[in-house]
Amino acid sequence: MFLERVNQKTGEREWVVAQEDYDMAQELARSRFGDMILDFDRNDKFLEGLKTTIPEKKKENGDGLVHVLDIANITFPGTGTGLLSLMAAREGADKVTALEVFKPMGDCARHITGCSPWAEKITVISERSTDVSQIGGTAADIIVAEVFDTELIGEGALRTFKEALQRLAKPGCRVVPSSGNVYIVPVESHLLKMFNTIPRINGGEDEHPLGTCSGTASVFDVQLSELETHEFRELAEPIVAFKFDFENEEKIIYNESFVREAIAHTSGTIDAIMMWWDIDMDGKGETFIDMAPRWKNPKHYAWRDHWMQAVYYLPDKKCVEKAQKFEIICNHDEFSIWFSDVGKDSTRSYCVCGLHSMLSRQTVYHINEMFEDQSFRAEVDRLSSGLNVVTVGEGSFVGLLAAKTAKTVTIIEPNERFRDIFHKYVLYYNMKNVHIVEKVTHLIEKPDIVIAEPFYMSAMNPWNHLRFLYDVEILKMLHGDDLKVEPHLGTLKAIPECFEDLHKIAADVNTVNGFDLSYFDRISTKARAATDAIVDEQSLWEYAGTVKGEPVELLTFPVDGRILSRKCVGKMDNMQSSNGIPIWMEWQFGDLTLSTGLLSTSESRKPCWNKGYKQGVYFPITNLQNESSINLNALFDKSSGDITFQFKKFDVQSGN
């Protein structure tokens, strides 16, 4: 078996051979299914749908027998834990056929359902519904399926329902959920705009260094509940973009476009379109799963991370005036949704500048935020003034900022596509003092200073940017130890935090809706305990919480050209009131401290996290969850360029 890994010293993706005893349960443990199973609002409403449809079908069928088909996709463990199948059997289904394509989850479902009082009723098949031609004799009377994602249809819900109704179900088959609605709200928001706009060095609306590319139409999934209300303005009331009938195969159409009308209740520019959906669980319009953000539906809001809200961008700038009627074209194909303006091309837009297709939304935001950060720009100006500057990184725009005051700037950029993008910026802004080379070894003359953010596009977490140390090592070998480098120091930090909800992604599920799912916990916990501690990467600004102490310094990295393996044992206190440990890097850049994580803390201990980076976060495994203090062991291995973590009980007697 081959697994893909990133070489943290070079950024290259490599295939490694897994050991013969590699346990796929480790992948299950890393996949973070916990919050899906602990989504009690969703569980209860699926249950309500089954409570409605099973008695109806028993009454309709002459023999009083009901066959339920439970369909899961690879991203959701509805079948994987057997939860929906168990619900159906307990509510009176005479036969339940469960489909689960992900083998570890299918095995888990077989064990859980096999140990239940309804074992004889439930059959688990490890195949996709679209690959199954028959399900054991009788066709299904009811389909219960959790095949949704942030876009509602992105995991193949339309084809799943259409083909299941055609091939695996009886005429008149009920579906739980029966239908879905997609809602959109056009908003003005400088913040959301920063996740899509091509970075402009001077911030002018008339600057087009990469042409007039509108970006990609792909979904930007985000926890909109964590946006502050002052960070956007709704320009109209929610619009119903699409209505999907999951019970009528003839009405399930893969490609559709609709013109939807709205009235602006305030003037502004449509910088973004917010989207969410709801689904009707009983077919009566009485029980809904509603994905509206907290500020839109505070009374019935339910947090979840397996589904989020979404943001889209129109291909062209559109302004509206108060009381003006305006129209938006709403489009979808089998898997995706996009929006366009009336009178313009409504086909799905794609990035033509190369920037959006290479970078995550988060990185586009990071570059825009860096360009707007006047303190950072002033420090770059000061450090670069009149000097021959070299910048290192992968996809780092800092060299373009240094050009303002530097005598010369040499951007070392290993990525060919980024070299092309930087050449376009250099030509557009007439930066005659900027040169671009591929490798550190291509630098012939000794520079006065090396500058970096540091930023490497291939980095998955903040400490992956330590690749910077290896670039500096080569530069100092070539040009001498006296070569000045900024930043001159990096620090790995951590802090205990009590998250309102995020910890649920790694929480034990135990008993859910009266069903014992603890076997799922056993295989997940065993797998997590058998590996190095699993530190997730999360955009922590999207998740509410309060910090329970001060940052703890774990490892320091002097940027002096000498790379040494390092280790530490840090004590994390206040863990009895915490459920997670965020981890990030800080860099001393001249007179500034640049944080990839915690930026500030409010009086109420609410943290402000850097939106331009993902942070690491560790969720204590079961045997550490009741400890008041735990030890955090961090080891940086110079041979791999990576950091591994271990978390252990704090030994009071030994003090470690």
UniProtKB/Swiss-Prot annotation:
GO molecular-function terms, A-Z: histone methyltransferase activity; protein-arginine N-methyltransferase activity
Residues making up the signal peptide according to the UniProt record: none
Record-level GO BP terms: chromatin remodeling; methylation; regulation of DNA-templated transcription
InterPro entries: Arg_MeTrfase (IPR025799), MeTrfase_PRMT7 (IPR014644), PRMT_dom (IPR055135), SAM-dependent_MTases_sf (IPR029063)
Matches recorded under Gene3D superfamilies: Hnrnp arginine n-methyltransferase1 (2.70.160.11), Vaccinia Virus protein VP39 (3.40.50.150)
CDD domains registered for this protein in UniProt: AdoMet_MTases
Record carries keyword Transferase: yes
Keyword line: Methyltransferase, Repeat, S-adenosyl-L-methionine, Transferase
Location of the SAM-dependent MTase PRMT-type domain: 12-338, 343-656
Domain of life: Eukaryota
EC numbers for this chain: 2.1.1.-
Pfam families attached to this UniProt entry: PRMT_C
Function (record text): Arginine methyltransferase that can both catalyze the formation of omega-N monomethylarginine (MMA) and symmetrical dimethylarginine (sDMA).
Family of the protein in this entry: Belongs to the class I-like SAM-binding methyltransferase superfamily. Protein arginine N-methyltransferase family. PRMT7 subfamily.
Protein name according to UniProt: Protein arginine N-methyltransferase 7
